[in-house]
């Protein structure tokens, strides 16, 4: 198919930093940094909004987890502030904080247009010499004795040194072609779009993304 014709086009496009794995935190930090520069480097609009995000804690276990994750983020250079209820209201004046013990405010978070980001990545890849083949289904992959990979497509076979499984929702099927079980499960998410909310518009600033565990 075309680029972004699968699940990408209707993704939320949220770019978070908050994660407890050091290696994944490094990847998140790199990705967020890349998205802030991608439009300038490629000329392709990405819709980046660096609005930050607040993740809320409702019990002591979550508070303890927030302290742990902040330690991880400090190691990779991602800015994270642990806020009390009054401080949360300063960042997000419209948020009702009753019942919350703490908020983890990651200032480098944001959101993008997933389709725009994908197209920008494609532009950057082509600028670096990559070739992109559209509407060309992969039907099989084979590991050759040389250590190279043979990728069988509907329009011919490609031999490559490295094969990256970036099939998204279909990565399990692509993994099976190589005899690999990919531990991935698809999940259904919901979102709704609202009309303009006068109270939000009156603030004249973009509010951070809020993650409520309840």
Label each PLM-derived region with a short phrase.
Residues 79, 131, 181:
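Residue-level detector of anion-binding/catalytic polar loops
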Residues 104-162, 170:
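Helical element adjacent to the flavin cofactor pocket in flavoenzyme catalytic cores
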Residues 61, 92-100, 142-150:
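A short, glycine/Asx- and small/polar-enriched loop/turn
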Residues 16, 141-214:
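Flavin-dependent oxidoreductases
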Residues 81-84, 132-134, 165, 211:
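General beta-strand structural signal in soluble alpha/beta enzymes
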Residues 13-91, 213-214:
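Dinucleotide-binding Rossmann-like beta1-alpha1 core, especially the glycine-rich loop
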Residues 1-9:
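Glycine-rich FAD pyrophosphate-binding loop
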Residues 8, 45-49, 183-185, 210:
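Short beta-strand
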């Amino acid at each position: 198919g075309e680029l972004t014709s699968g699940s990408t086009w209707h993704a939320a496009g949220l770019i978070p930093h908050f994660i407890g794995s050091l290696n994944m935190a490094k990847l998140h930090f790199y990705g967020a940094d890349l998205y802030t520069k991608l439009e300038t480097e490629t000329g392709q609009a990405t819709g980046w909004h660096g609005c930050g995000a607040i993740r809320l804690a409702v019990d002591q276990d979550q508070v303890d987890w927030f302290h742990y994750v902040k330690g991880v983020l400090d190691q990779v250079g991602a800015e994270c502030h642990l806020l009390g209820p009054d401080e949360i209201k300063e960042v997000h004046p419209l948020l009702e904080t009753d019942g919350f013990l703490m908020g983890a405010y990651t200032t480098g978070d944001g959101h993008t247009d997933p389709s725009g980001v994908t197209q920008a990545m494609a532009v950057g890849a082509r600028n670096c010499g990559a070739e992109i083949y559209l509407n060309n289904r992969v039907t099989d992959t084979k590991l050759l004795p040389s250590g190279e990979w043979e990728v069988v497509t509907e329009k011919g076979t490609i031999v490559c040194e490295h094969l990256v499984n970036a099939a998204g929702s279909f990565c399990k099927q692509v993994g099976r072609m190589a005899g690999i079980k990919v531990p991935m499960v698809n999940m259904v998410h919901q979102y709704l779009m609202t009309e303009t909310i006068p109270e939000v518009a009156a603030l004249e600033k973009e509010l951070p993304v809020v993650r409520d565990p309840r």
